[in-house]
From Swiss-Prot:
Gene name per UniProt: ypbE
MF terms (GO), sorted A to Z: lytic endotransglycosylase activity
Transmembrane segment boundaries: 57-77
Topology of this chain in the membrane: Single-pass membrane protein
Name of the molecule in the record: Uncharacterized protein YpbE
Native source organism of the sequence: Bacillus subtilis (strain 168)
Record keywords, A-Z: Membrane, Transmembrane, Transmembrane helix
Amino acid sequence: MTNMSRVERRKAQNLYEDQNAALADDYVDDGESLPTRQSVKNQREQKKKQGKTKTPLFTVLAVIFVFVPVIVLVTLFYLKSHPDNHDDYEDVFIDSSQSKYEVVPKSEDKNDTADTKETALQKESKKEPEDSKPKEQTAADKKQTAVAEKEDSPNKEEATAAAASSSQSTVQQQEQPAEPVQNVPNRVVKHTVQKKETLYRISMKYYKSRTGEEKIRAYNHLNGNDVYTGQVLDIPLMDE
């Protein structure tokens, strides 16, 4: 719809310009002639040409797409025609004894390389027996320690068993409670608990202190300090 409307407007504008050009040809204002129809058309065409902006991007892209394959082909052809010359390189050998890189020039004889290899092999052969000696010593030491451990294992087991038995006996002796030394009372008094009488009062009556509570409780096999009215208690007394 937008394209059709633009075309229609463009046609109406062209028609309007043509009409103005026709009127300009027929009328003369103040003795000066108006531009002709042909001149108006020429001006309009020039404006259209000037309105079209020339974008160089398309031309640049076209040139790039043309020249890139050409450059690639030229480089490939050059590389194929001029291969790398490997004769210019020199051989490099590594001496394991010094751990340094040595560059052997191409002009030297091959005998030097053979000599260096022989010296390296001799040094390695000397190092091998020296390295094997400590390994043999360590193996012999391990064997001796294993034999000694086997010989000592029965003695260790006997010692551990004796220590365990002694520790068990000591623990049992410690766990056994010491038998309390019971003092035999000189005489025992029968006491009948009266109303509102407590173990504390009975102790103060016979022993004049609270130490008698424990004695009365132990002698009568009481679990606590509670006594009831009418209960008969045995009061052990020690004559001083």
